[in-house]
């Protein structure tokens, strides 16, 4: 699971990352990455948005758990104080963990290439 220090819970920061961050989308999800000034005391944080359009509460929680597990593998590669928001789209409800992993990796490569390039 994703550690508590890496979880994003502040609504204002969610909105800022979605409005000002770099965006990449695939069929099952959209990723927003906001890279700010590196702060040594603040690690990269990851937040998730899974709306009712994805499915009922059981399905939404299942999708969130899968995404949290997948994001755990990538959080160490994010720059310090970066904010990553992963927004699940309705097809994520029927996607396998492998499909979600593939889409997340491709989105991260796209926003990462834009940030460093």
Swiss-Prot record:
<keyword id="KW-0255">Endonuclease</keyword>
<dbReference type="GO" id="GO:0000049">
    <property type="term" value="F:tRNA binding"/>
</dbReference>
<comment type="subunit">
    <text>Consists of a catalytic RNA component (M1 or rnpB) and a protein subunit.</text>
</comment>
<keyword id="KW-0378">Hydrolase</keyword>
<dbReference type="InterPro" id="IPR000100">
    <property type="entry name" value="RNase_P"/>
</dbReference>
<comment type="function">
    <text>RNaseP catalyzes the removal of the 5'-leader sequence from pre-tRNA to produce the mature 5'-terminus. It can also cleave other RNA substrates such as 4.5S RNA. The protein component plays an auxiliary but essential role in vivo by binding to the 5'-leader sequence and broadening the substrate specificity of the ribozyme.</text>
</comment>
<protein>
    <recommendedName>
        <fullName>Ribonuclease P protein component</fullName>
        <ecNumber>3.1.26.5</ecNumber>
    </recommendedName>
</protein>
<dbReference type="GO" id="GO:0030677">
    <property type="term" value="C:ribonuclease P complex"/>
</dbReference>
<keyword id="KW-0540">Nuclease</keyword>
<dbReference type="InterPro" id="IPR014721">
    <property type="entry name" value="Ribsml_uS5_D2-typ_fold_subgr"/>
</dbReference>
<comment type="similarity">
    <text>Belongs to the RnpA family.</text>
</comment>
<dbReference type="GO" id="GO:0001682">
    <property type="term" value="P:tRNA 5'-leader removal"/>
</dbReference>
<dbReference type="GO" id="GO:0004526">
    <property type="term" value="F:ribonuclease P activity"/>
</dbReference>
<dbReference type="InterPro" id="IPR020568">
    <property type="entry name" value="Ribosomal_Su5_D2-typ_SF"/>
</dbReference>
<keyword id="KW-0694">RNA-binding</keyword>
<dbReference type="InterPro" id="IPR020539">
    <property type="entry name" value="RNase_P_CS"/>
</dbReference>
<keyword id="KW-0819">tRNA processing</keyword>
<dbReference type="GO" id="GO:0042781">
    <property type="term" value="F:3'-tRNA processing endoribonuclease activity"/>
</dbReference>
<dbReference type="Pfam" id="PF00825">
    <property type="entry name" value="Ribonuclease_P"/>
</dbReference>
């Amino acid at each position: 699971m994703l550690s508590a220090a890496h979880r994003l819970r502040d609504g204002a920061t969610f909105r800022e990352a979605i409005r000002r961050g770099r965006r990449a989308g695939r069929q099952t999800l959209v990723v927003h990455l906001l890279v700010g000034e590196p702060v040594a005391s603040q690690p990269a944080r990851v937040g998730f948005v899974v709306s009712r359009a994805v499915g009922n509460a059981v399905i939404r929680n299942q999708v969130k758990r899968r995404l949290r597990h997948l994001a755990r593998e990538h959080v160490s590669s994010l720059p310090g104080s970066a904010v990553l928001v992963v927004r699940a789209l309705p097809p994520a409800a029927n996607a396998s963990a492998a499909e979600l992993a593939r889409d997340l990796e491709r989105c991260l490569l796209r926003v990462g290439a834009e940030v460093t390039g």
